[in-house]
């Protein structure tokens, strides 16, 4: 990326991004490099498959055009972000030629939660910072963002595969949120056992452990009622607040997708076994 003149930075989840957080300058710089290397670009051409003679067919501004190259590399993307052209419309074209495909699904996406009206109205858009998120033994130290429909952000995307697996297996999945990742249960219990007098439990949590706002709302959401008074029970809840995931956000809102060309449809060189000379690359696999 930096070789293209675009400064990069690594985010908290280990992903690398353009420093300006825009992809278009990176794309323009890459296209210039390709053209400087002799590549000829044909914009506004939409691939339509093959004709009876095996030539590639495109819809172009001047009408249908064909090409019969010695080799073809397909890099057609997944099935999200339709407005930018990534719609997965190529999958039936390959399937018709006998190439194995897998149904598309969302990846690196938001997830649905049946929040109470209180959470939707008061905390939609709020980040839950400095927490540990876990799903079925996989975990990440990060943050998540509450949305009107559920949860999203980098920490959620890191666990998206595990969440999707749980949804496929059980119909729902459970995201556990450790609100106090730097404290163990005994340390939390010691704080909770301090006299609170006439303070409410919410005030006691705020003053003794700094748990307030959206974090406190997640606690109440988990119990859907009165918080437990027993220090050990409450401490364990603080270390593993369960959030019931009921589904994924719509496919077209996903950052990327699973599915596409099946791995067993390709040889070691990523050539389609059913279509010699046709190779696949990128998210379409």
Language-model region placement:
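Glycine-rich loop(s) and the adjacent beta-strand/alpha-helix scaffold that form part
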Residues: 71-117
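A short alpha-helix-loop-beta-strand transition element characteristic
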Residues: 4-16, 38, 98-107
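Residue-level recognition of phosphate/Mg2+-coordinating polar/acidic sites
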Residues: 3-14, 71-75, 81, 132-278
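Hard-cation-handling environments
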Residues: 283
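Acidic, Ser/Thr/Pro-rich intrinsically disordered regulatory segments
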Residues: 112-144
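A conserved short coil-to-beta-strand element within the FAD-binding core of flavoproteins
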Residues: 40-55
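General small-molecule cofactor/ligand-binding pocket signal
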Residues: 40-42, 102, 279
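Short beta-strand to alpha-helix junction loop
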Residues: 13-32, 41-42, 81-86, 112-116, ...
């Amino acid at each position: 990326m930096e070789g293209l003149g675009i400064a990069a930075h690594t985010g908290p989840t280990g992903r690398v991004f353009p420093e300006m957080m825009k992809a278009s300058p990176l794309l323009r710089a890459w296209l210039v490099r390709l053209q400087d290397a002799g590549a000829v670009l044909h914009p506004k051409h939409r691939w339509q498959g093959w004709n009876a003679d095996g030539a590639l067919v495109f819809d172009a501004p001047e009408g249908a055009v064909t090409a019969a190259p010695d080799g073809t590399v397909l890099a057609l993307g997944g099935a999200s972000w339709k407005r930018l052209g990534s719609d997965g419309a190529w999958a039936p074209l390959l399937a018709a030629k006998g190439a194995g495909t897998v149904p598309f699904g969302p990846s690196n996406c938001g997830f649905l939660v049946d929040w109470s009206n209180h959470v939707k109205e008061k905390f939609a858009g709020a980040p839950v910072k400095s927490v540990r998120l876990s799903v079925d033994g996989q975990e990440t130290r990060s943050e998540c963002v509450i949305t009107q429909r559920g949860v999203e952000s980098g920490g959620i995307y890191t666990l998206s595969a595990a969440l999707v697996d749980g949804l496929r297996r059980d119909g729902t999945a459970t995201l556990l949120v450790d609100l106090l990742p730097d404290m163990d249960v005994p340390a939390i219990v010691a704080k909770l056992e301090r006299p609170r007098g006439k303070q409410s439990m919410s005030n006691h949590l705020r003053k003794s452990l700094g748990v307030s706002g959206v974090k406190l709302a997640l606690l109440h959401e988990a119990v859907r009622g009165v918080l437990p008074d027993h220090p050990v029970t409450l401490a364990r809840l603080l270390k593993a607040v369960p959030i019931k995931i009921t589904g994924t956000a719509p496919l077209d809102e996903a950052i990327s997708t699973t599915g596409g060309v099946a791995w067993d449809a390709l040889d070691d060189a990523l050539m389609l076994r059913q279509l010699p000379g046709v190779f696949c690359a990128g998210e379409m696999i």
